[in-house]
Every structure is written in structure tokens, then in C-alpha cells.
């Protein structure tokens, strides 16, 4: 059995555009590649021309998993000075190639209890992972791939997104006493958020947030009757504590509408790996049928989604070693 050319496979995948919602072409190429290496492959429909690629040679006790959708804009691969560039180089087509290479190394050594679960849609809604989770599995472990700088994830933070809406009364700006500024009310509330004591966890740290969107007003010479902001919390622990703090902080001055809620996730770790808490989210919560989760991958999240996304080739090759060794250790028990 020929070893996988991890850089070559990564470049093949990177060079097929697969912006979220357009994953069909790359999925079919991947499925055919795995069939050519002797895998039994399921092309699981997700929606429209979107499919997951689920592969194995036996009954898996452990699966490698990551996603092959990417954020826009697409740009093709190139290699320079020992670095692989391209959309998806680190998030997550390079990771996918390393996982395939690790699975093939294990298979060459006689280990056939490895499965592959590669999904669409991680970047927006985790549609592929949700579809994959409808499949019954006997897998005991899930090694999910995201750019972790080759550290094992100890946990990922949760998400809690809200819209804050302030209401006022329109009036001529020359007579402010006749109106009530919704923008000023909203500014006061946002200032209060900065002073609040948000929930914390000894291992995961303190909840933090970003005010990502602000809208309000109708004209410079009109007292604004309406203003709103969207606030995105990266959370730790139980969200009820966050809700309580938020309600006490806004104190009825604005309306609070919840838009998105995803829990923080604690992950399995093993001795010998550096660990870290990651502020981003992953497909892990939506793949609960596939075993106890671990999170590991080459590359850094700090260049994912950028116009210079890349992964160091030495790290990509090191990831193959780590994936194979980690899987073998877990399967030995």
C-alpha cells in the first residue's frame, strides 16, 4: 500500500472550490480517491449538491473527522519556503489530508478499526455534522481536526449571541427635550456591559464578548427613536448564569433577544500533549454518536479565514505522526 502524499492530497482538495453550500465537487473527488485506496465509502446527502464522505474498511472503533467546506473567497494552493498556502490549507483541507495519511499508516500496520467522517457545512450551521450524527456508530473515539497548533484541545468555548434593542422618541434635534435618544440609551447599556463581572471557570477562563453590529438613527438632525446592537459572547459554563448577569446589567433599559446559543465543550485529553482552551467552535457537539471527542490539528486559527491562510508543511507532516500515534494509543486502551 503506497503512503499518502499528504501535501499532494491537500493541494488537490484546496484547488477545488468548496465554499460552504458548494461542497459537492470536492466531496466527489475525495470519495473517489478513498474508493481507489480500498475504502467502503458512503456519500451521505446533506442538502442539494452537498454531501458528506464517510469511509471505512472495517467496523470503526475510532474515527478521524473534519470538514471540507471553506469560507470565501477561494484562492488556489501554492508552496513557498516550506509553507502550503491556499483556502483551506489549515481550515481544514490540510488537516483532512493528514488524517487520511494517518489512517493509511495505521492500516498498513494492520489496524483496520479506523473510520473517516468528512463533512460539509462546518463553517455555517454544522449541517453536515448534524446529518452524520443520524448514523448509528459503534465508534468509541472521535478525533476531530481543527487548527490547534498541534495541541490537544482541553475545551472549546460556547457561543451566546443576543440583540439589544433600545426604543426612544423621535423629535427635532433642536428640541432634544421633546424626544428620547435610543442611541444614547444603547450606549449607556453597552458601557454597563464593560463593567459587568461575567461568568468564569477555573480552567476555561472568563466569558468575553464582542459588540459586532450597531444600527440606529434616521438622520443627523433627528433624535433617534430606535437603536440596536448585536453582542457575541464566547462563553464558559452554564448559560443561565450569563443570562442572569446580562439581565441584571441591562436592568430593563433595552430589549434582549437571543439569536444563537451553543454550549462550551470539554474534550478528552491524554498525557504527553500540551493542551489549550480554544475560543472557536467546532462540529464536535454535533457528532456525539461517534465517540468520546478529542480535538487536534496542524496550523493556527490566527491565519484561518485570512487572505494568507497557510500551514507549515513540517507541521502537516508532524500531524500525520501525532494522529497515528494518538489513535493507536486510544485503541490500545
Short names for language-model regions:
Residues 1-89, 111, 295:
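Acidic/His- and Gly-rich active-site-bordering loop/insert found
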Residues 97-161, 201-202:
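Acidic/histidine-rich catalytic neighborhood of metal-dependent amide-processing enzymes
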Residues 24-28, 96, 243-244:
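Short, surface-exposed alpha-helical segments at coil->helix boundaries
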